Amino acid sequence: MKISLIAAFAKERVIGKGGKIPWNLKEDLKHFRNKTEGCSVVMGRKTYESIGKPLSNRLNIVMTRTPKKIKDVTEVINKERAMEIASAFSEEIFIIGGERIYEEFLPLASKMYLTEINIEVEGDTFFPNWNLSDWKELSRKDCKDLNQNIEYSFLEYVRTVSYTHLTLPTNSRV
């Protein structure tokens, strides 16, 4: 099981404001879809509500303190249960936000797919601080949206120091 964080953020690590993403980059959405299709995605309730529907061709797992029995979504109350269910569906588990969910899974992640967007926007939701010395950049692709005049970069990082593994019970059932 590999846990990967996937996120796009502007300067100051802004990932959202008022439950919305403060930019619209089609290539980033395409990148997100290409990376996550066929895999498990874990998100918080607010992220799910901002998307408004389950993401197609993925196992959608929503972490929430108050499950509401959402159709076509698996709701869980903790990261251990999220990982247990997700690992039965796919080898790579993508953590897609929001802020609190990224914070919970960052110590467990072995890979990060980040889109750094070179714009300043106001935000109330942020990607967590992370220690760059714990990670190695595997790839970087610098891009520009000519219609919006926005520069951005797709980055892929792998953790270089050992990280916390969460051991699942051997007799766990999904």
Report the location of each language-model feature.
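Enzymes that bind and transform nitrogen-containing heteroaromatic metabolites
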Residues: 1-162
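Conserved small/polar residues in nucleotide/adenosyl-binding loops
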Residues: 164-170
